[in-house]
């Protein structure tokens, strides 16, 4: 695949800045109330979210205010037809009735005067710029060369609910394949395919959840219930991504060894088409390609040890380092477990009983 087809890290940064700006103007904020008032009053507006020497250099006229932002005041200032300059947090009004003179050589795809000025100002200064169109009755946000039109909360909520239904189906399938993998790990019957399927499903769940999180940000106070539902569905998913890689990533070989973070970044960088290919997923997690999918592989035991209540991460690391594989852990007696640093008799019994319970429940879930 061509390098320019892959997600760029600069795009990731742009997404984060757009999301942060959307949070500052989401429903429930003074800024969003101000924008709604301007729109309802059939008035246009040009608002810059930030002020520095670059912004100052393209400002002409207007007057200084430096007062706390309020929706009624913003509505009145918008009637003057000049641009309004706010601080970066969108909590204070710095200047009003300003004539912006951005570099006319900066390319823009907009046709309206206000929108052209907004896009050029955003590109030249690096600050987000909001344009409220009087004729089209839309609110457009310009951030890092992107244009984002604010939708009605009802439309966003409709899309979010569809995405949430998809996430529920994805999570159900993830639970199924994860349970199957646990049973296969206990029986020492895992193949590369089994591990790759779980890694694939975890990444698919993470991606749809990230999309929903964007809707939560854009909905502001209207997205509280959606946020609670998302948190409930995602409980334990992020740690599971880390654990599946720790279990199956081959041991580092000198300087060429890849870290868990490297693998997670590579999974994140896969295109949707690549993510559907189990061979590609297997290659990313270090288990070879399509030709190796049916090869047997043994986990280290991170996933199952993490399911034992009140077992610290440091102890899990020492147990895995000492025994090396899950099968050796399962075969270990209480005395064997006590030989590990930081594991006393009480904890050794807890680990032994926990592994036995997990083995029993995993087998029952698979065959009963």
From Swiss-Prot:
Residues 101-121 are annotated as: Disordered. Disulfide bonds: none annotated. Residues 112-121 have a biased composition (Basic and acidic residues). Keywords: ATP-binding, DNA damage, DNA repair, DNA-binding, Magnesium, Nucleotide-binding, Nucleotidyltransferase, Transferase. HAMAP family: DisA. Its EC number is 2.7.7.85. The gene is disA. Homooctamer. Residues 15-153 form the DAC domain. It comes from Acidothermus cellulolyticus (strain ATCC 43068 / DSM 8971 / 11B). InterPro entries: DisA (IPR050338), DisA_sf (IPR038331), DNA_integrity_DisA_N_sf (IPR036888), DNA_integrity_scan_DisA_link (IPR018906), DNA_integrity_scan_DisA_N (IPR003390), DNA_integrity_scanning_protein (IPR023763), RuvA_2-like (IPR010994). Pfam families: DAC (PF02457), DisA-linker (PF10635), HHH_5 (PF14520). This is DNA integrity scanning protein DisA.
């Amino acid at each position: 695949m061509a390098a320019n087809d892959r997600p760029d890290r600069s795009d990731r940064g742009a997404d984060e800045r757009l999301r942060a700006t959307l949070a500052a103007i989401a429903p429930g904020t003074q800024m969003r109330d101000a924008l709604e008032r301007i729109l309802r009053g059939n008035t246009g507006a040009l608002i810059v979210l930030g002020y520095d020497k670059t912004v100052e250099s393209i400002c002409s006229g207007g007057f200084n205010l430096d007062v706390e932002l309020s929706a009624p005041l913003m509505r009145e200032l918008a009637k003057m037809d000049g641009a309004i300059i706010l601080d970066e947090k969108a909590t204070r009004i710095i200047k009003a009735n300003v004539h912006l003179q951005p570099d006319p050589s900066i390319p823009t795809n907009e046709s309206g005067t206000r929108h052209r000025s907004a896009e050029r100002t955003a590109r030249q200064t690096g600050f987000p710029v909001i344009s409220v169109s009087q004729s089209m009755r839309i609110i457009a946000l310009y951030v890092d060369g992107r244009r984002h039109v604010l939708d009605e909360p009802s439309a966003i909520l409709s899309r979010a609910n569809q995405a949430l239904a998809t996430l529920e189906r994805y999570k159900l399938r993830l639970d199924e394949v994860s349970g199957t993998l646990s049973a296969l790990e206990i029986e020492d019957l895992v193949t590369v395919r089994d591990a790759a399927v779980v890694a694939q499903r975890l990444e698919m769940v993470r991606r749809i959840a990230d999309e929903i999180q964007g809707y939560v940000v854009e909905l502001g106070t209207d997205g509280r219930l959606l946020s609670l539902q998302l948190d409930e569905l995602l409980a334990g998913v992020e740690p599971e991504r880390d654990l599946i890689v720790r279990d199956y990533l081959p041991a580092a070989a000198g300087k060429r060894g890849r870290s868990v973070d490297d693998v997670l970044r590579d999974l994140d960088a896969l295109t949707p088409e690549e993510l559907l290919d189990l061979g590609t997923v297997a290659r990313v997690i270090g288990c070879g390609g399509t030709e190796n999918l049916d090869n047997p592989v043994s986990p280290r035991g991170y996933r199952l040890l993490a399911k034992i209540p009140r077992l610290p991460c440091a102890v899990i690391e020492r147990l895995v380092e000492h025994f090396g594989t899950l099968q050796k852990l399962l075969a270990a007696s209480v005395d064997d477990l006590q030989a590990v640093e930081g594991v006393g008799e009480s904890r050794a019994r807890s680990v032994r009983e926990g592994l036995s319970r997990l083995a029993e429940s995993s087998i029952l879930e698979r065959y009963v």
